[in-house]
Structures are given as C-alpha cells and as structure tokens.
Amino acid sequence: MQIIPAIDLKDGKCVRLRQGKFSEVTVYYDNPEDAALRWQNEGAEVLHVVDLDGAKEGKIGNLPSIKKIREAFRGNIEVGGGIRRIEDIELLLSVGIDRVIVGTIAVQSPDFVKEVCKRFPKKIIVGIDAKDGLVAVKGWVEVTEIRAIELALKMQDYGIWGIIYTDISRDGMLTGPNIEATKALVESVKVPVIASGGVSSIEDIRKLAEIPQLWGVITGKAIYSGAIDLKEALRIIKGDGVKK
C-alpha cells in the first residue's frame, strides 16, 4: 500500500484548508517543490497534488508550481482540482503528470469521463467525495442522491485508472478514516482505490493497510502537523508485510 502525501496549492503555495473552506488556510511551504523534495527524501513514491484555485475557477490555476513539483519529484504524480476540460488534461499530461483526477464532472457529465478515458487510457482517476455513502459535488457544497458505490462501478466500466475515495465529513479534521465505507468500496470495484480523508495517526494507516487490495492512502494535515512521521509510517507498512 502506498502512503501518498498531499500537496494542496493556492496562490502558488503549499497550503491546507480546514474542511475545504477557503477562509481557513494554513500555509506550509511558500515553494511547493520543497514539500515534494521533503516527501521524496522521506520515501514517498507517489504525490497527490490539488490545485485549489483550479477547483474554484474550473481551469488550471497553479501550472508553474505543478511544473516545479514535477521537476523536483522522481515518482508518480496525480493532479486534480477543477479539471473539466480536455485541454487541461492534455496540458497536465504534456508537462509530465502521470494521472489526472476528475471529480464533480463525473456526476454532471459522465460522457466526458467516457471520452477522456478513451483518449487517455489508464490516465484518469475519478475522485469520489461522499458523505454518509452519498456523493457530494461542487467542492463539497452539494450532496446528491447518488450512491458512491454506484458511481464507482459506472466509472470503472468507462476505463478509469482508479478511484480516490474521500469521506468528506472527516477530511482535514484528524478524526480517523471511515474504514467501513472505504472497505465496502474497495470490495465493490476491481480498479485501484486510494483512501483519503481524516487520516490522523499511524494507527489509522495501519487499520487502512488491513483492507485487502487498498492501493494507497492520502495524508495531508497529519504529516504537515507532525501527527504522522512519514518515514516511520512507511517503515511500519513495509514491516507489516502489507502489499504495496
């Protein structure tokens, strides 16, 4: 199982938002590539980059920072945040990003996902944000009647690379992940699933690592605040003999 550090970008800086609120921002690094190098040095093989300005505006907002992160980091990088246009996916892939994450558009325009999966095979990740098992869209503002597992199965049929599953009631709150909901989703699909939201301790990572077939877990606030030591977490996962 991969432990995947998150780098959230706003105004060219590495930040965290509390529960997705743009009014509650903590700046961790003025130069996001410094964060990328830190996590690489601590053993990360995959980075999760979110363009928060892009999520707000619906078009790429932090391309210079994304390029600098790509130059600094040797492993795989996935990027998301307001990606709703084919040209934005093309642009990100052209600067060396490995996989592109789409979110809200998967609910609003499933045909878009179908089309980009055909154009860019195994390059598309669908981010599914859910609250009480129901899909939330528009930066968590709106909860739909669509069940997360139903959406995941539909997207799997389109040929996505995998799914990032976020339990939004727990994200950035350090309350622990929703193990049951994550396990249910992993068991329902065949594509890789990456868990996100609420990971606050090495114990949380250990619990997630017990879910067979879970591909990875994203951690943000906990590694920046020091609640999780990334090196130690990676050592424990490997020491436990959990498959990566």
Swiss-Prot record:
Reactions the enzyme catalyzes: 1-(5-phospho-beta-D-ribosyl)-5-[(5-phospho-beta-D-ribosylamino)methylideneamino]imidazole-4-carboxamide = 5-[(5-phospho-1-deoxy-D-ribulos-1-ylimino)methylamino]-1-(5-phospho-beta-D-ribosyl)imidazole-4-carboxamide
Recorded GO CC terms: cytoplasm
A biological process from GO: L-histidine biosynthetic process
GO molecular function (one): 1-(5-phosphoribosyl)-5-[(5-phosphoribosylamino)methylideneamino]imidazole-4-carboxamide isomerase activity
Keywords for the protein's UniProt record, in alphabetical order: Amino-acid biosynthesis, Cytoplasm, Histidine biosynthesis, Isomerase
Compartment(s): Cytoplasm
NCBIfam families, sorted: 1-(5-phosphoribosyl)-5-[(5-phosphoribosylamino)methylideneamino]imidazole-4-carboxamide isomerase, PRK13585.1
HAMAP family: HisA (MF_01014)
Family: Belongs to the HisA/HisF family.
Protein name according to UniProt: 1-(5-phosphoribosyl)-5-[(5-phosphoribosylamino)methylideneamino] imidazole-4-carboxamide isomerase
Encoding gene (name): hisA
